[in-house]
Amino acid sequence: MASQDDPVQREIHQDWANREYIEVITSSIKKIADFLNSFDMSCRSRLATLNEKLTALERRIEYIEARVTKGETLT
């Protein structure tokens, strides 16, 4: 019976090692996904802010161009 326990024990230990490895991989994938989601949100926020600033600059340029075209002074 001892000879039968040895392969069974080895299989059990291998199964636990596999489960631990899978847990490490799963945890790492979750951390990567969390980072990517956070990075995405940060980029979207920064791009939205940049877009607002560019839109304001474009409007200001259009306003200045219109005043220059009409010959008005800018002061």
Curated annotation (Swiss-Prot):
Q: Where is the signal peptide?
A: none
Q: Which GO terms describe its cellular component?
A: cytoskeleton; SCAR complex
Q: Where in the cell is it found?
A: Cytoplasm, Cytoskeleton
The record's GO molecular-function terms, alphabetically, read:
protein-containing complex binding
* InterPro entries from the UniProt entry: BRICK1
Which chain positions lie within coiled-coil regions?
Answer: 41-72
Q: Which GO terms describe its biological process?
A: actin filament organization; cell motility; regulation of actin polymerization or depolymerization
Task: Give the top-rank taxon of the lineage listed in the UniProt record for this protein.
Answer: Eukaryota
**Sorted UniProt keywords:** Coiled coil, Cytoplasm, Cytoskeleton
Q: What protein family is recorded?
A: Belongs to the BRK1 family.
Role of this protein: Involved in regulation of actin and microtubule organization. Part of a WAVE complex that activates the Arp2/3 complex.
What's the protein here called?
A: Probable protein BRICK1-A
Protein's organism: Xenopus laevis (African clawed frog)
Q: What is the lineage of its organism?
A: Eukaryota, Metazoa, Chordata, Craniata, Vertebrata
Gene name linked to the record: brk1-a
